[in-house]
């Protein structure tokens, strides 16, 4: 993509309405625009990051055996009355009526709808286990939306729903999602810690929140520092095998949100030097809720003996749009965003330091075409801005690799390669650049 043809409305000043780093940098970098309180338009740069995150989530869900579908944003109120949650959910749920006076709601979550789909088609235990997921926009009418995408009213979320014949099988499904989440967040360059948490309006008696430690987080957390060094399973993990050792390794080290924090256990189990009390950002949460929805909505299957019994369920959410903000909170410096490579909107930025110079223009064009041909996401700054402004833009939007091309270096057949994560620079041969940066 040529920057001269890209829509990148960068702001020079810090927006006054932005209270935290991620909100400020997303607005300054031209990633989004607020259209109403807690509702944003995703501009091209932000949209590219959103799609990268969404794809990682999708790949790890598929790897764990979940199957993608897509449910609508609007749901029938009668489904929620059937589960008993319509009146219990509260003012965060946006309730509307169509022209025929049918009561609808803009879905804040999808347990009822997926249970209705399941019960319409699945009648036997032989069709289990089953895990269905979708990635869809949701709406919760927060009383005080703030912090940009961290606490917006409209947000993109992945939610998966597992169906199993009994509790033992359901806990295996829960464990698969637990491990899938560890891998998902690690691929994004995040250290997300699973912590015991309240189940809230979803229900059930088992839940873990996945928390990224950050002082700007809304959740108070307590944990043993040892959890920060636990290994994340690699891509060879066998989701059909026994995942219990992995789960035990991660859950045997104390980590809890303040809602379920056990001070006595914390002080008895965690050495004082290892105690960490801080704040964090919730980027995902998983639940096992047993027969909560299958009982009320009569989602039964015939067991091996032919007797109908309610299925055991779980739900598993990832805040896809919230992750954009969480990554920025964890990965930034005074100059701007520092994107991990897997979620960066572009992997490489080519900076033409003397636009109009024939040799520099030709070298940049050649690099741009060769990198693009290799499948590299590349942004070529071919504008007539001065070099300092180009450096500032590249740092602000956080492109992992910057290729600095100017007449002085080209005279020796070299370009300067800058790594955004640590600011390191090196001179390399122009002829070696593509091989160095192509995956």
From Swiss-Prot:
Q: Which GO terms describe its molecular function?
A: ATP binding; proline-tRNA ligase activity
The residues the entry assigns to the signal sequence are none
> Which UniProt keyword terms apply here?
Aminoacyl-tRNA synthetase, ATP-binding, Cytoplasm, Ligase, Nucleotide-binding, Protein biosynthesis
Q: What's the protein name?
A: Proline--tRNA ligase
GO cellular-component term (any):
cytosol
- Annotated localization: Cytoplasm
An example of a Gene Ontology BP annotation on this entry?
Answer: prolyl-tRNA aminoacylation
Q: From which domain of life does this come?
A: Bacteria
Q: How does it assemble?
A: Homodimer.
Enzyme Commission number(s) from the entry: 6.1.1.15
The protein's predominant localisation is cytoplasm
Query: Main role?
Result: Catalyzes the attachment of proline to tRNA(Pro) in a two-step reaction: proline is first activated by ATP to form Pro-AMP and then transferred to the acceptor end of tRNA(Pro).
Gene3D superfamilies under this entry? Anticodon-binding domain, Bira Bifunctional Protein, Domain 2
Annotated source species:
Rhodopseudomonas palustris (strain HaA2)
Q: What class of enzyme is it?
A: ligase
Question: What catalytic activity is recorded?
Answer: tRNA(Pro) + L-proline + ATP = L-prolyl-tRNA(Pro) + AMP + diphosphate
Taxonomic classification, please?
Answer: Bacteria, Pseudomonadati, Pseudomonadota, Alphaproteobacteria, Hyphomicrobiales
Family membership, please give it: Belongs to the class-II aminoacyl-tRNA synthetase family. ProS type 2 subfamily.
């Amino acid at each position: 993509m040529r920057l001269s043809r890209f829509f990148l409305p960068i702001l020079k000043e810090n927006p006054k309405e932005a209270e935290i780093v991620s909100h400020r940098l997303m607005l300054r970098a031209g990633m989004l625009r607020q259209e109403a309180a807690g509702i944003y338009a995703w501009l091209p740069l932000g949209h590219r990051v959103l799609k990268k995150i969404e794809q990682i989530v999708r790949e790890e869900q598929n790897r764990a055996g979940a199957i993608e579908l897509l449910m609508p944003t609007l749901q029938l109120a009668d489904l929620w009355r059937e589960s008993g949650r319509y009146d219990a959910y509260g003012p965060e749920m946006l309730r509307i009526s169509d022209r025929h006076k049918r009561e609808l709601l803009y879905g804040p979550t999808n347990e009822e709808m997926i249970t209705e789909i399941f019960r319409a088609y699945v009648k036997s235990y032989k069709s289990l286990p089953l895990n269905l997921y979708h990635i869809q926009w949701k709406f919760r009418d927060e009383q005080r939306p703030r912090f940009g995408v961290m606490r917006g009213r409209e947000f993109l979320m992945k939610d998966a729903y597992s169906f199993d014949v009994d509790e033992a099988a359901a806990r295996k499904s829960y464990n698969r999602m637990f491990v899938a989440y560890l891998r998902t967040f690690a691929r994004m360059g995040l250290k997300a810690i699973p912590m015991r948490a309240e189940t809230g309006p979803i229900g059930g008696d088992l839940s873990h929140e996945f928390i990224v430690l950050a002082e700007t987080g809304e959740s108070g957390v307590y944990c043993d520092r040892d959890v920060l060094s636990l290994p994340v399973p690699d891509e060879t993990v066998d989701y059909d095998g026994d995942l219990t050792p992995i789960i035990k390794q991660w859950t045997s080290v104390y980590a809890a949100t303040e809602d379920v924090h056990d001070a006595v256990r914390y002080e008895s189990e965690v050495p004082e030097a290892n105690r960490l009390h801080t704040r964090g950002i919730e980027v995902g949460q998983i639940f096992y809720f047993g027969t909560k929805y299958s009982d009320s909505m009569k989602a039964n299957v015939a067991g091996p003996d032919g007797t109908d019994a309610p299925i055991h369920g779980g739900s598993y959410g990832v805040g896809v749009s919230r992750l954009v903000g969480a990554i920025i909170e964890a990965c930034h410096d005074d100059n701007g965003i520092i994107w991990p490579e897997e979620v960066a909107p572009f992997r490489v930025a080519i900076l033409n330091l003397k636009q109009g110079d024939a040799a520099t223009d030709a070298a940049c064009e050649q690099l741009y075409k060769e990198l693009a041909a290799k499948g590299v996401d590349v942004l070529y700054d071919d504008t007539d801005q001065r070099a300092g402004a180009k450096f500032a833009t590249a740092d602000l939007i956080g492109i992992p690799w910057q290729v600095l091309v100017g007449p002085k270096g080209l005279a020796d057949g070299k370009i300067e390669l800058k790594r955004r994560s640590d600011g390191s620079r090196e001179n390399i041969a122009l002829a070696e650049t593509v091989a160095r940066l192509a995956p």
